[in-house]
Amino acid sequence: MLIDAYGRRISSLRISLTNRCNLKCIYCHNEGEEDSGSEITVEEVAQIARICARYGVDKIKFSGGEPLLRRDFDEILRALPPMRDVSVTTNGTLLAARAESLKESGLDRVNVSLDSMDRDRFTFITQCKGQFDKVLDGIDAALSVGLTPVKINMVYLKGINEDEVDRMIDYVRGKPLVLQIIELMNFHGAFKYHADVASLEQRIKEKADKAVCREMHRRTKYYLGGAEVEIVRPIDNSEFCMNCNRLRITSDYKLKPCLLKNDNLVSVRGLSDAEVEAVLIKTVGAREPFFKSETAKVCQPYKIYEP
Ligand SMILES: Nc1nc2c(ncn2[C@@H]2O[C@H](COP(=O)(O)OP(=O)(O)OP(=O)(O)O)[C@@H](O)[C@H]2O)c(=O)[nH]1
Ligand SMILES: C[S@@+](CC[C@H](N)C(=O)[O-])C[C@H]1O[C@@H](n2cnc3c(N)ncnc32)[C@H](O)[C@@H]1O
Ligand code: SF4
Ligand code: SF4
């Protein structure tokens, strides 16, 4: 097993396939990457997945940039060892045409980013015109081929989409969709749009029929009359970081222990399996939570919480 000094076991990989994107979202964290060189290859993805699988890693999330800009994404999926959960986070604009083949290539599910149901707001956030309908088509295609549950990622933005939460909850209700409401992290000076997710969560909690705490980040998912709503609150959240159980891989094949740090990246490009394995063990051992608690110093065993 891959365990760090805080008792956090690495059970999943988050692999960035590219820095390129066809949208220009005003807040984009680009998975914490700065400009990188050439993109990770099919063989490199297969290598890190194969090695990590030997240590019990059974989940892979692909992200970016826009991962569907990789024309060889099907090939990447087919090169993976058996996994319990393979998913991608995408802006959805290129999904409609590719959903079926991605499913056939082994993708289990997708997260689609959609911050607003209002065309003009969507255009402002993404700084691109003519893409909104493509995203809705992408979600429909994912549903029809069974890339489910489809999570709808909504970054909660002050003065932009705060009034759309109920509408988004109605959109996901009764379908294999989950609404994931995400606290904005400060990138590109977009923090002026930071909205209070803690108060929103309190309101959702009061209306919920049931709540379940996920192992990853100890995020809570609420059930509201047939709708599922997950809240992601990463900022100043030591519990979130203490339950961070995945290792990031950058789009130029470096191990990246934390989204918010770039001074501890380790390149594994060109290394043999044995060399990658040695670097992996050392890098995981040195991993630290970004936000730390004075009292809770180790990851606590997982249990299901009910409200
Ligand atoms: N600080 C921090 N934020 C994260 C991390 N992972 C995810 N997030 C936040 O959560 C948001 C949603 O992430 P997704 O790519 O949809 O994937 P996920 O929710 O982590 O994974 P699944 O729920 O399993 O699909 C991201 O945009 C980030 O804002 C992390 O490791 N650290
Ligand atoms: C960086 S994007 C990459 C994948 C894909 N292009 C997409 O937009 O879904 C991954 C996720 O990060 C979210 N995200 C980007 N910047 C963020 C920020 N500053 N704070 C919180 N979430 C952010 C996006 O909304 C998206 O759901
Ligand atoms: S679509 Fe994703 S990667 Fe592209 S700019 Fe928006 S958040 Fe960033
Ligand atoms: S340690 Fe915290 S900030 Fe860093 S990647 Fe994990 S959850 Fe995100």
Curated annotation (Swiss-Prot):
GO terms for biological process: Mo-molybdopterin cofactor biosynthetic process. One of its GO terms (molecular function) is GTP binding. InterPro entries: Aldolase_TIM, Elp3/MiaA/NifB-like_rSAM, MoaA_arc, MoaA_twitch, MoCo_biosynth_MoaA/MoaC, rSAM. It holds the Pfam family Mob_synth_C. Its cofactor is [4Fe-4S] cluster. Binds 2 [4Fe-4S] clusters. Binds 1 [4Fe-4S] cluster coordinated with 3 cysteines and an exchangeable S-adenosyl-L-methionine and 1 [4Fe-4S] cluster coordinated with 3 cysteines and the GTP-derived substrate. GTP binds at R14, K61, T89, K151, R246, L247, R248. Keywords: 4Fe-4S, GTP-binding, Iron, Iron-sulfur, Lyase, Metal-binding, Molybdenum cofactor biosynthesis, Nucleotide-binding, S-adenosyl-L-methionine. It is an enzyme of class 4 (lyase). Belongs to the radical SAM superfamily. MoaA family. This is Probable GTP 3',8-cyclase. It comes from Methanocella arvoryzae (strain DSM 22066 / NBRC 105507 / MRE50). The lineage of its organism: Archaea, Methanobacteriati, Methanobacteriota, Stenosarchaea group, Methanomicrobia. The gene is moaA.
